[in-house]
Amino acid sequence: MTGLRSDMITKGIDRAPHRSLLRAAGVKEEDFGKPFIAVCNSYIDIVPGHVHLQEFGKIVKEAIREAGGVPFEFNTIGVDDGIAMGHIGMRYSLPSREIIADSVETVVSAHWFDGMVCIPNCDKITPGMIMAAMRINIPTVFVSGGPMEAGRTSDGRKISLSSVFEGVGAYQSGKIDEKGLEELEQFGCPTCGSCSGMFTANSMNCLSEALGIAMPGNGTILATSPDRREFAKQSARQLMELIKSDIKPRDIVTEKAIDNAFALDMALGGSTNTILHTLAIANEAGVDYSLERINEVAARVPHLSKLAPASDVFIEDLHEAGGVSAVLNELSKKEGALHLDTLTVTGKTLGENIAGREVKDYEVIHPIDQPFSEQGGLAVLFGNLAPDGAIIKTGGVQDGITRHEGPAVVFDSQEEALDGIINRKVKAGDVVIIRYEGPKGGPGMPEMLAPTSQIVGMGLGPKVALITDGRFSGASRGLSIGHVSPEAAEGGPLAFVENGDHIVVDIEKRILNIEISDEEWEKRKANWPGFEPKVKTGYLARYSKLVTSANTGGIMKI
C-alpha cells in the first residue's frame, strides 16, 4: 500500500531515527509500508463499563494484524459517573470529555496513524473520542464495550443502577427497609458493561449506529455476549476497508447524519446528555446545528420505544427485539423521518444497513402507526427563563403530564437542594430550581441524579418539577428540565429567580417561563452581585474560564 499517512514517520533517510524507535517498540521490517492503526482503548479498573476492555484491545489488535495492519494501542482516562455522583467528583465528569478529546487528538496527530479503532463505552468517553475523530479526520470505526445485563431481584424483577439510586430515596422515606435497599445494591449491577437502561452511555452507543460511525449492533449487543467479541473483530477488519476506500469521519458525520442520530434519540427517548454531546460533536465536524432543529426532528419522529428508567424494558430487551437497526427500519416507514442516503462505516448507506431488519417484538418497539407519542422523546423548551433553550426528556415524564406550574423553591447548589429535599422543604406542586451548576458555574455541569432520584423515591416524581442549568443522568426521570441556557453563572435568568416566583412549564408548547413584571426583573438584574468562581486552581478553574453554556454543547473556546 502506498501513499500512507504514516509515511511521514517511516519513509526516507531522515526518518532513520524514527524507524529505530519504532523497531524498539516492536515494529518489524515487514511492517514498514503497512497501515499504522491507532487502537484507542479506555480500559480502566474502576469503571464497570470498561473493566473488560483490555480483552477487547487484544481482539481488535489481532484482527488488524490479520487484515494487514500494524496496531498500536493506547488508553484514555475515564470517569464513572455513578461513582462520581453526589460529590466533587461529578464536577470532573463533563470536563473529562475535553481531556479525552484532546489526548486522543494529541496521540494520533503526533504519530501520524493511518486509521483508528476507538473502544469506548461509558458516558463521556464515547463523545470525547468522537469529537477527537472529527478533528483528526482519518478513517475511524467505533466499537463500544457493550451494555450490562439487567439485574434481577430475588423475586425475578429486573432492575438497574437507577433502581438503586431511587431505592435510597425510598428507604429514607420509609417505603422500603434496609434489607430491601441492600438487595437493590447487591443485584443492581450484575456484570461488566454500560449500565443496562437507556442511560447516557447506551444512548450514545446506539446513536453511533445512526450517525454512521459504528457498525450495526454497536449499541445493543451485550458486553458479556460472545457476539460482542465477534463484533469487535468485524469492526477492526472493516476499518482496513475504510482506509482502502479513504472514507473519513467528516464524510459520514454531516447535518443529515446528525438528523438521523437525533431521530433515533427521539424514537428511543434517550438521555438528555445526548443533545449536549451531539452538539459538541457537530461543532468538531464543522456542522452548524441549532437547538431549534432538534425540535423540528422531534416533530416528525414518533417515540417508539420506552426503556428503563421510564419502564421495565432494558437494553437487552431492545436487542432481542431487533436492536437499533429494527428501530430505524420501523422509522423509515414514515416519510421524512430519516435520511436513508447517508454514508456509514460499512461503506453502505444507512438505508442499505437497515433494509429487512424487521421488529421482532412490537411490545418493545412499537409499530410506526402505534407509537407511545407522535412526537419524539426529547424536547427543547424556550422562554424568558431559558432564552437559549433548555432540555427535557419527555419520554421520561409520566403519561398525561404536559404542563406544570407552581412556586419556585430555589437552591444555589446540588448539595443544598439535596439537603432541602431530604428535610422536606419541597412539597407537591413545587418547582425546584438548582442553579450555579452549569458548565461554568458548577464547574463542570454536574448531573442531578441524586436530587431527582430522591424526589422519585419519596413519591413526588409526578408532582414536582426540577429546573437546573446543570444536567441529568440518563437514569433520571420525571419533570426534569436541564441545560438551561444561558446559565446562572453567566448572568442567565435562573440567577434572578426567588423563592415563591410562579414558574410555568408547558411541554406541548415548548415553553419555560417565569411570571414576573419587567420592572421587577430589571431590578433583580441590577442588584445581582455576579458570580464568584467556586474553584480557583487546577483544571476545573481553567475549564470554568473557557467553557460555553449547554446550548452550544458545553465546549471549550479560547
Swiss-Prot record:
Pathway: Amino-acid biosynthesis; L-isoleucine biosynthesis; L-isoleucine from 2-oxobutanoate: step 3/4; Amino-acid biosynthesis; L-valine biosynthesis; L-valine from pyruvate: step 3/4. It comes from the Bacteria. InterPro entries: Dihydro-acid_dehy_C (IPR042096), DihydroxyA_deHydtase (IPR004404), DiOHA_6PGluconate_deHydtase_CS (IPR020558), ILV_EDD_C (IPR056740), ILV_EDD_N (IPR000581), IlvD/EDD_N (IPR037237). GO terms for molecular function: 2 iron, 2 sulfur cluster binding; dihydroxy-acid dehydratase activity; magnesium ion binding. GO terms for cellular component: cytosol. One of its GO terms (biological process) is isoleucine biosynthetic process. It catalyses: (2R)-2,3-dihydroxy-3-methylbutanoate = 3-methyl-2-oxobutanoate + H2O; (2R,3R)-2,3-dihydroxy-3-methylpentanoate = (S)-3-methyl-2-oxopentanoate + H2O. Homodimer. NCBIfam families: ilvD, PRK00911.1. This is Dihydroxy-acid dehydratase. It comes from Bacillus licheniformis (strain ATCC 14580 / DSM 13 / JCM 2505 / CCUG 7422 / NBRC 12200 / NCIMB 9375 / NCTC 10341 / NRRL NRS-1264 / Gibson 46). The gene is ilvD.
